[in-house]
Amino acid sequence: MSTGKTVQIIGAVVDVEFPRESIPKVYHALRIDDVGLTLEVQQQLGDGVVRTIAMGGSDGLRRGMAVTNTGAPISVPVGTKTLGRIMDVLGEPVDEAGPVGEEERWSIHRKAPAYEELSPATELLETGIKVIDLICPFAKGGKVGLFGGAGVGKTVNMMELIRNIATEHSGYSVFAGVGERTREGNDFYHEMKDSQVLDKVSLVYGQMNEPPGNRLRVALTGLTMAEFFREEGRDVLLFVDNIYRYTLAGTEVSALLGRMPSAVGYQPTLAEEMGVLQERITSTKTGSITSIQAVYVPADDLTDPSPATTFAHLDATVVLSRQIAELGIYPAVDPLDSTSRQLDPLIVGQEHYQVARAVQGNLQRYKELKDIIAILGMDELSEEDKLTVSRARKIQRFLSQPFFVAEVFTGSPGKYVPLKETIQSFKGIVEGEYDHLPEQAFYMVGTIDEAVEKAKKL
């Protein structure tokens, strides 16, 4: 246990000088006991000086304070004692319910599983959300990204997925709140408590108001807890809200560490940092991690380096579109932009595949005809095109669905739609069985039978 002293403090970056024979290693944790602050070593500058990032506010620090080297990376509690608790980046409880009382602690920096230990993900995971199950099905042990700009419903979709999967799937879940609103964290905690699944969820928060060090490392803290459950042979769910804030924290830290920025001001190590995190989120022969990650898209630009780097790592991408949200269709998933590796006749079966492609084909044709309709009106279309447009508008409305977590706001009870019913319903619309129903009947209903009932009342 060597001791050093602080020599320079610039925001969240603190330089510490140690005796030359006992310089701490990169990623080792240091403690400033006077203020109870943990630092993480990022660079060795030579002459016994290391550059560190503070895992907390650096207010009240001054030069010459004593710093202790713990001789190991940051470690956090793992295991069943973390369930039902809210912890911060260091694994300290923040829910005022006493110590975690863990039996084991793991380092947050770990190697990704070896290539021969990985197992492919092909089993489907039903979410009960029509548009997702039909167009971009999720795999058990797969990685899913929810992409969307500000205010199109990433967090609400995430909450609904957690509600549907966590209540239907009886395993453990870990939720990492990375740089999101504290209010959402609080809402989420109460949502879990009310649906009686809190005792199966570990919550790790590093919110918007935290220093960049916390936001950069909190994703790793949550991931480490999920990895422990996976190594025990369980199938665990990992929710991360929001991956973009992880990148953003990296950008803030990178600038403070004095690195040259790359495109759009991001850190030069963007792809590597993303890879280090994403390669650990994977399924092995022992157990699986199914991860659902919200990805904020700055200014609705999917080609921005941050979302673009995330795309490469995912099995399924659910793209939320502002144009669809403007029509009042929620979930605002874009069925033409969202993709999934699972949408393959060998995995989902021929019928599901054909129905999904027919739905997309109809919507694509409608999109192409929109300009003609805007200029010349519906009357100028051929009979066949009129029918396509009418069906596409029904499909578009039928892709909306009332959510359980949004009941309070919408006043309509949530619906969980099994995959079989989803496929049959859309097959019927595409084949023209419901051409006689008005399109309003398809808006905000669960199954097709509800649409038929609704049509009778109109």
Curated annotation (Swiss-Prot):
SUPFAM superfamilies assigned to the protein according to its UniProt record, in alphabetical order: C-terminal domain of alpha and beta subunits of F1 ATP synthase, N-terminal domain of alpha and beta subunits of F1 ATP synthase, P-loop containing nucleoside triphosphate hydrolases
Single annotated GO MF: ATP hydrolysis activity
Primary location group: membrane
Membrane topology (UniProt): Peripheral membrane protein
Cell inner membrane recorded as keyword: yes
Statement: the UniProt record of this protein carries the keyword Secreted: no
Subcellular location: Cell inner membrane
Taxonomy, superkingdom: Bacteria
CC terms in the record's Gene Ontology section: plasma membrane; proton-transporting ATP synthase complex
Annotated EC: 7.1.2.2
HAMAP family: ATP_synth_beta_bact (MF_01347)
Family the entry assigns: Belongs to the ATPase alpha/beta chains family.
Record function comment: Produces ATP from ADP in the presence of a proton gradient across the membrane. The catalytic sites are hosted primarily by the beta subunits.
Record-given protein name: ATP synthase subunit beta
Organism the protein comes from: Nitrosococcus oceani (strain ATCC 19707 / BCRC 17464 / JCM 30415 / NCIMB 11848 / C-107)
Lineage: Bacteria, Pseudomonadati, Pseudomonadota, Gammaproteobacteria, Chromatiales
